[in-house]
A protein has these predicted regions:
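Conserved SAM-binding loop and adjacent beta-strand
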Residues: 12-28
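A short acidic, Gly/Pro-enriched loop at the edge of an enzyme's catalytic core
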Residues: 98-110
Length: 238
């Protein structure tokens, strides 16, 4: 696909901040045709270094709460300031996605790019841990790394060059995720599908020099990418 919004984030400085396959491009594809209005209060769930949070604030005009457990909110705030964003429009929050510190029905929407698979595999997560903080009618938009077909009973050797079976347990196919989110009582499934983004977002990641990207090259150079995809899920709170 053509990444119209993301291309301005292809600078060396910003790309060095990504923590996996290019999350900005994944976020752009995820939000194609989205119904979230400008000035909506949005949680960037698992925001990492805050690059997707900047993208959401600048390109869509959302008021963004950049929630992440592992990133330093002080560092993220400095980054947001450097990017010229008003402090009232983007707020870094250090929090656990399973114990969010917000008022009930605080958010108009939630966007989660390349992180939901770490905390959202509990079938009660949506109903118990996330939806209480979303207004009725609000959207939950999720982009996650997945598998074209679950193969945990016979993992391909190419994948094991970079990842352990325990790490691969966080990745599943479309049917797994569709069945999981359909168990949610408080939200309707709008769509769940395989994303077009794959090889290009991986290429952006693999050319980085950090140790995690270097480690992932082993599997991808051996052809492991043919087993992998990205999955988008959109739900709406009832």
């Amino acid at each position: 696909m053509e990444y119209v919004k993301s291309k301005k984030y292809d600078t060396e400085e910003l790309q060095s901040m990504i923590m996996g396959p290019n999350p900005v491009k994944l976020c752009e594809e995820l939000l194609i045709g989205n119904q979230i209005p400008e000035n909506a209060v949005v949680c960037d769930l698992g925001s990492g270094s805050g690059l997707t949070s900047v993208f959401l604030a600048k390109e869509y005009g959302f008021v963004v709460y950049a929630e992440d457990l592992w990133s330093d909110p002080v560092e993220n705030r400095r980054f947001f300031d450097r990017m010229g964003l008003d402090r009232s429009r983007i707020i870094p929050i250090k929090a656990d996605a399973t114990d969010l510190p917000f008022e009930k029905e605080f958010f108009d929407a939630v966007v989660s790019t390349d992180s939901y698979n770490y905390f959202g595999r509990d079938e009660r997560y949506l109903d118990d841990k996330l939806l209480p903080f979303v207004k009725t009618g609000g959207y939950i938009c999720i982009a996650i790394p997945g598998m074209k077909k679950d193969c945990h009973d016979a993992l391909p050797p190419e994948l094991l060059l970079s990842w352990t079976p325990e790490q691969l347990e966080y990745m599943h196919d479309l049917s797994y995720w569709t069945a999981l989110v359909k168990k949610c009582v408080g939200a309707e499934l709008v769509c769940a599908k395989e994303m077009e983004s794959n090889s290009e977002v991986w290429a952006d990641w693999l050319k980085q020099d950090n140790e995690y990207a270097v480690g992932d090259r082993k599997s991808m150079e051996a052809g492991g990418g043919k087993y992998l995809n990205f999955i988008s899920i959109v739900l709406r709170k009832k």
